């Protein structure tokens, strides 16, 4: 059997996984389309799609209120909402269909089922919270937090690294495992024709459970982002 080849694009020293890039673009398009559709023709008394959008915004605002000072919460509400919606859509993207090449390579997976993507997303969050910490509190005050108390400086730096790593691995582990189990259930249906009804029912139940877990992971990711951000920008953390 011919070995499956992953579509790649090389631009100078950087190599892009075209499959991952494509599903990321699809994720962004879905998020944009949903917000654009739900925010059209908004009314003073919300109903239908507007109610759903406002509920999501209020839900994410509640996360920010728990971890950010009141005067800062509104400044980051849109960021947290975007992160939550993006991760929620990305987590669920690979659950509902499968697109394989003749070599057996799956072209349609959740972006968050790719460890490199999760590490990049986690790195973005880590850099963002530190940049915001410097912008809000100043470089000296920001570095002072990492060195207070000074004997704990190595542990504080280690904590920053473990926060970055755990944010990515937690997301990857849950989403990747969900897609693996979904693939095994589909293989069960292909094994024998009389297994198909059982596999169908099991797959429906597992998909519903996976959607729930994916949304929980989006919530956890957003909550941890708000937590890390609050530690860097809140005046109460002085």
Swiss-Prot record:
Belongs to the ATPase A chain family. The keyword Nuclease does not apply. One of its GO terms (biological process) is proton motive force-driven plasma membrane ATP synthesis. Coiled coil: none annotated. This is ATP synthase subunit a. It is found in: Cell membrane. Keywords: ATP synthesis, Cell membrane, CF(0), Hydrogen ion transport, Ion transport, Membrane, Transmembrane, Transmembrane helix, Transport. It holds the Pfam family ATP-synt_A. The chain crosses the membrane at residues 18-38, 76-96, 114-134, 166-186, 193-213.
């Amino acid at each position: 059997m011919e070995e499956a080849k992953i579509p790649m694009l090389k631009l100078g020293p950087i190599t892009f996984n075209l499959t991952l890039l494509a599903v990321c673009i699809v994720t962004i398009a879905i998020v944009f389309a949903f917000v654009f559709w739900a925010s059209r023709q908004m009314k003073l008394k919300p109903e239908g799609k507007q109610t759903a959008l406002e509920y999501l915004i209020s839900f994410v605002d509640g996360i920010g209120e728990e971890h950010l000072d009141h005067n800062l919460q509104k400044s980051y509400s849109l960021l947290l909402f975007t992160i939550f919606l993006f991760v929620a859509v990305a987590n669920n993207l690979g659950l509902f269909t499968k697109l394989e090449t003749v070599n057996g390579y799956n072209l349609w997976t959740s972006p968050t089922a790719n460890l490199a993507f999760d590490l990049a997303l986690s790195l973005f969050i880590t850099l963002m919270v530190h940049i915001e910490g410097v912008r809000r509190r100043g470089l000296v005050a920001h570095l002072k937090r990492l060195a207070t108390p000074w004997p704990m400086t190595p542990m504080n730096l280690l904590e920053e690294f473990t926060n970055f790593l755990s944010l990515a691995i937690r997301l990857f582990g849950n989403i990747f495992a969900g897609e693996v189990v979904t693939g095994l259930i589909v293989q069960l249906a292909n094994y024998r024709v009389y297994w198909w009804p059982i596999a169908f029912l099991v797959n429906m139940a597992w998909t519903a459970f996976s959607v729930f877990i994916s949304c929980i992971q989006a919530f956890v990711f957003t909550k941890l982002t708000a937590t890390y951000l609050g530690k860097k920008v809140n005046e109460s953390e002085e």
